[in-house]
Structures are given as structure tokens and as C-alpha cells.
């Protein structure tokens, strides 16, 4: 697979490529040098994906601040398990 410029990939493309790399590494059939290159590529993709998620989170917070004057609360996993973020 030709190495694409990591920063220019969309989040979905980076995640898809990362999933393929994980599958290849889990199979354990790659030669050591190839596995190391794939691991390095995976780290790059994971970092870029994390940055894109953080940027999206910031955009959502900005949009919420513009739309409402209420206090924003950080998203936590507990809020998705039946608790409402407005119940504080």
C-alpha cells in the first residue's frame, strides 16, 4: 500500500487504514521489518485521528456556546449510561 500523507486523510480513512494495519499485525504473518513499518504507520494514524477528534470536539463546543448561553459540561462516559447531562 502506498503511504499517503497522514495529515491529509479524513478521520474515516485514517481509522479504516488503522484497522487494516491492526488486522495485519494481529495475524503475525508479516516479516519483522514490515511489521515495524506498519506499526509506525499505525502510530501516525492514531495520532492524527486523535487530533481530528479533538478538533471536532472543539467545534462542537463552540457551536453549543454560540447556540446557547448555558454552562457546558465536559462529556463523560457516565453521561451516556442513562444519566442526563442537565441533571447537576
Curated annotation (Swiss-Prot):
Q: What class of enzyme is it?
A: hydrolase
Location relative to the cell? Cytoplasm
Just give the chief location class: cytoplasm
Q: What is its EC number?
A: 3.1.11.6
What this protein catalyses is:
Exonucleolytic cleavage in either 5'- to 3'- or 3'- to 5'-direction to yield nucleoside 5'-phosphates
- Cite the GO molecular-function annotations of the record: exodeoxyribonuclease VII activity
UniProt keywords, alphabetically: Cytoplasm, Exonuclease, Hydrolase, Nuclease
Assigned GO CC terms: cytosol; exodeoxyribonuclease VII complex
**What residue stretch is flagged as signal peptide?**
none
Which InterPro entries did the record assign?
A: Exonuc_VII_S, Exonuc_VII_ssu_sf
Report disulfide bridges, numbered on this chain: none
Example GO biological process: DNA catabolic process
PANTHER family of this UniProt entry? Answer: EXODEOXYRIBONUCLEASE 7 SMALL SUBUNIT (PTHR34137:SF1)
Subunit structure, as described in the record:
Heterooligomer composed of large and small subunits.
State the protein's purpose. Answer: Bidirectionally degrades single-stranded DNA into large acid-insoluble oligonucleotides, which are then degraded further into small acid-soluble oligonucleotides.
The similarity comment for this entry is: Belongs to the XseB family.
Name of protein: Exodeoxyribonuclease 7 small subunit
The source organism is Tolumonas auensis (strain DSM 9187 / NBRC 110442 / TA 4)
